[in-house]
Amino acid sequence: MGPTDQDWIGCAVSIACDEVLGVFQGLIKQISAEEITIVRAFRNGVPLRKQNAEVVLKCTDIRSIDLIEPAKQDLDGHTAPPPVVNKPTPVKLPHFSNILGKQQQLQLQQQQQQLQLQQQQKQQFQEQEREQDLPSTPRSRANDNGRVAAGGASSSSGPRGNFNSALSDKMHQLKLIETNGSNGTLRTPQTSRASSAQQQPQISTTPNSVAAFFGNMIPPKVEVKLGSYVSNTRESYCSSSGDSGEATGLSLGSSKPIDIVSNGDGFYKQTAASSYGNTNGNVRRNGNANNNGNGTGNGSYTNGNGNGNGKNKRNRVRRESSMRQQQVQLTFGSEADDPLIHEDFDFEGNLALFDKQAIWDDIESTTQKPDVVRHIVNNHHHKPEQKYRHDENILASKPLQLRQIESMFGGSQDFVTDDGLIIPTIPAYVRNKIEISADKAGLSLQRQIDILARGASDLAITLLGGARRLTPANNHQWPKIAIICDGGKNMRTINIGAATGRQLASHGLTVLLYVEQAKLLEQNSSSPEISLFKATDNVIVHSVDALPTPDLVILSTNTANLSDAIRKWLSVNRASVLAIDPPPCGINEVAIKYSILPILPLNGISTATTSSSSSAAATPTPIASTSAAASATKSAASTNNCGKLYLCNLGIPDKFYRDCGIKYKSPYGHKYVIPIHSKD
């Protein structure tokens, strides 16, 4: 009885196809009259990416099939020297993105050389067999005749009854695997292929599929099926618990060539090419091997039962290897025929998007102009985008009532705040009437003076630099302030000046109070404000010569004409002048820079020149240098005005405004002192 299809399963074959497919080598898994299925395949000497992949070749594409002979024994039972077997040379896996081109040409040349060498070796081997007159076997007869049919039937001659028995005897004679009881490893005594493969393992990063490995090299005629040897028992050619190290090595993509040795079932198994070892790359498999393949031992990295530490380590190594492969695939996984590589960059289209003429016009329009003009031009062309404030309502609301204060008296002049609210002026007698009405209701004149002095002191501290200058680290050069109370015929202006000096002294500033009318102080020695000012240990002087060089001068007077000595001293002095409730017409020959007013401004009040912007008047500028103050004094010496105006909130209720004929709503918001500007 001749050999059946099942007798060829497990045999190592070399299948030569047409020029397009090339030469395949592997183990026969399934064979029929129409097709043959091999596993652990090599194509043109290059191993497949996955060792558990199945390659199905149709008989119409196969030109010849050659059996790859294992090691054999002579008639005396001694192992003969192994013949030269045309096994695939270990080839380092190529970089798959560059697998086409010159590399393919080199592979084709290598394939042709291998085919020629294979034919020469086969002829030599056949001549040796004829000389020794060995009994023929199915494999030798197949080689003598030179070919095996594509359908799996043999074309050899001879008795078919002895063919199967001879094949079985030959398979049993080739069982050369010995079990080493001391360490549980598998060895082949007379071949050096397994040991050399263990000494030089080649482990490379592999793609996700066979198609990704070969790319365009596998034609569509070859069906590549990725078998799952874990779920399908029929496809598990590397089974049994004792072979867990081999399965692990195969799953990691070992590129070791096929070792052709047989077992009792007719399968050819590859010895472990790679296993988990120490950091220097040596292969370590310790333990005792038994018949069922289970291994035990101390310090074993891969054993049959799956030691807890070894199993966790293997799982961790698999996860890390999988993550590295995914990262490499994401980084370098672009195909060689990626259309983006061959797409040309449109330089002309990209250049057309750049408006060079507009850039040149902008450069030429500003390069030849002075810095001031260039700054104005840039601000004109590049206007900042108007944005909403964090507290501004973006929804439409009722129109803002800018005129919240309405006066029924004639001669009124309108001022505006920074928020655009209109502040009208009122006659002097109306303001006096409001003060008297509040005094009668309990808000005494002394309390009103104290609130006005508080607003004046806050404004003075801001003008002196505020937190930038009044710090403990700058205590050695704190400013000095001179308060001038001149020309007053009553104690009101003196009390305002004394209260302002007291509150400034409470901040640690040095204050000198100048009062020309010494007799007036003697007559009103019981004035509470004078007594409180003396308690601050500051000095009241009556001579201009006793005045130091101050950083700020505060005028508290209601007359437009000062004494000659004070005017001369002010003209020589370079300090800025802050006036508290000055006359509406200003002070003759005195350049007032700032003025603070109670309640509402009076009719006919004169402000600073129109050249000064409203934005600059909105925030008081600290006194930076005496030279700047001197230049400002000279420019404004010929004008009689009150400078920049500030309005102080005295806390008078709205009822007293209405009683005096003024429709009033507070314009102060969150401040006690607000700047006002001329509406014109």
Curated annotation (Swiss-Prot):
Residues 1-71 form the Sm domain. GO terms for biological process: deadenylation-independent decapping of nuclear-transcribed mRNA; mRNA catabolic process; P-body assembly. Residues 331-440 are annotated as: Required for interaction with Me31B. PROSITE patterns: DFDF (PS51512), SM (PS52002), YJEF_N (PS51385). The modification Phosphoserine is found at residue 136. Residues 430-658 form the YjeF N-terminal domain. Belongs to the EDC3 family. In the process of mRNA degradation, may play a role in mRNA decapping. This is Enhancer of mRNA-decapping protein 3. It comes from Drosophila melanogaster (Fruit fly). The gene is Edc3.
